Amino acid sequence: MTDRVRKPEWLKINIGANERYTETKRIVDSHCLHTICSSGRCPNMGECWGKGTATFMIGGDICTRSCKFCNTQTGRPHPLDANEPTHVAESIALMKLDHAVITSVDRDDLPDLGAEHWAHTIREIKRLNPQTTIEVLIPDFQGKMELVDLVIDARPDIISHNMETVRRISPLVRSAANYDTSLQVIRHISKKGVKSKSGIMVGLGETPEEVETLMDDLLATGCQILTIGQYLQPSHRHYPVVAYITPLQFTKYKTVGLEKGFNIVESAPLVRSSYHAEKHIR
């Protein structure tokens, strides 16, 4: 099955825009910022922007990697914008966010892979928004833990790193990323005493048994929060959808994950990494 096959009813969404959506878009555009909501064609953008929330993407909008599931543009990135951390922090203040989520493209072209830019952004958000909690969804930094430490030392409240898929499928869809390296990054975050989180997509051909094995692998790292959502093929050039997972199976995954020991499991067809993230800080 490919994503050109008609989607099931449970995947149909309403993108309707309201005044809050329009204002969120105005703030993002006026500060020349990027969001994973738009670059990743997130199905929840209408809902989240309509509530005045967005996931900011730093480091530009061009990624040095070319994962087969991701819609973000790939190629040679532009130099970092030194004003971006302040612009992100100012936008968060204008949006009056209680909880901010930040992610980034991979910047394998930079000596520090973008780690100091990450840390600077977190510090600027804290400076202008001292009451706002911060969640960051970071790349693997090529498994260089001293770079992960730069992010940890800036003291975000939650650090997330996505496994994306089960071990068998990981090399088929992840560019320059490694299943075990990702586990090591999450383990390092957990050992530092930071609340850790990860997310996966299903519908890529994995089995329920493989998903449960991935859960066990994550729990062994100390990961506390897991998100599970349906993979949707961004274009014909991307990896095809193998199956549309039923809402019942998503419910089963949530039940199994909680029984195994995760503190929080968000599992539904339209769940994405930052969906309802404000609830995860509690």
Which positions does each model-derived feature cover?
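Short connector loops/turns at beta-strand edges and beta->alpha or beta->beta junctions
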Residues: 61-64, 97, 164-166, 231-233
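Core AdoMet radical
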Residues: 72-87, 94-145, 152-184, 197, ...
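Glycine/Thr-rich phosphate-binding loops of Rossmann-like dinucleotide-binding domains
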Residues: 66, 110, 169, 236, ...
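Auxiliary Fe-S-binding modules of radical SAM enzymes
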Residues: 1-55, 86, 90, 96, ...
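Local cysteine-cluster metal-coordination motifs and their immediate loop/turn environment
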Residues: 36-48, 61-74
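A secondary-structure boundary/capping signal
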Residues: 38, 59, 103, 137, ...
